[in-house]
Amino acid sequence: MCAGLGGPSTDAAAVIVALAESWGIDRADSALDNIARGIGADVPFFLHASPAFYVGGGDVLATEYPALPATPVVLVKPREASVSTIEAYRRFDETPAPADKPGAIASALHSGDAEVAYALVHNNLGVISAQMEPRIQTVLDWLRSQNGTVAVNVCGSGACSFALCDSAATAVNLAAAAQQNGWWAYATELVSDTVRIEAPKK
């Protein structure tokens, strides 16, 4: 889908979690992070359910924070838009987009202040992606002009964007309006129990 939603990485993390569960391995075992790191830089992130701060190449867990409350969100992507993650990082390395130091958002996450944390959301790689694919910027501008959005930004390297919303109804209405614009859109929510095993009933 080339959306920046971490599809392959979440699939890999899901397999690791499922195998750990099946083999009776504690999910807190650092060996699982090492295995995940060998697959891809962002796979370790998806092994953990709570917000976290990673260092190094983005694959070394430094700090985990308390889970945030369930929050309505809408995902929006121009149907034909795509961004090469490799190219986005290459351009970022050539001309890095500045970003605020993480101290303020880390403090908000540590105290569980979702409102402040969401207000500080920033994706400096998304700046590059929007330059590469102008339709991303069109979606961002549209989302930011809508009532009820709490935070708007690019998902990963794009081409999907998200808007955290003040209510589930807002997310649903925005998804419907985005679809009327010809974009792919989906209303959902951020949840705190993202890493879990759901075995089929026998």
Where are these regions (language model features)?
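Short pre-catalytic strand/loop immediately N-terminal to key active-site residues, enriched for Gly-Thr
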Residues: 1-4, 149-152
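DPxDG-like acidic metal-binding loop motif
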Residues: 3-31, 45
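Phosphate-handling active-site elements
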Residues: 18-39, 167-178
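Conserved, helical-rich catalytic subdomain that frames metal- and/or nucleotide-binding sites
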Residues: 48-151, 166-169, 176, 187-202
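Short hydrophobic/aromatic beta-strand micro-patches
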Residues: 162-164
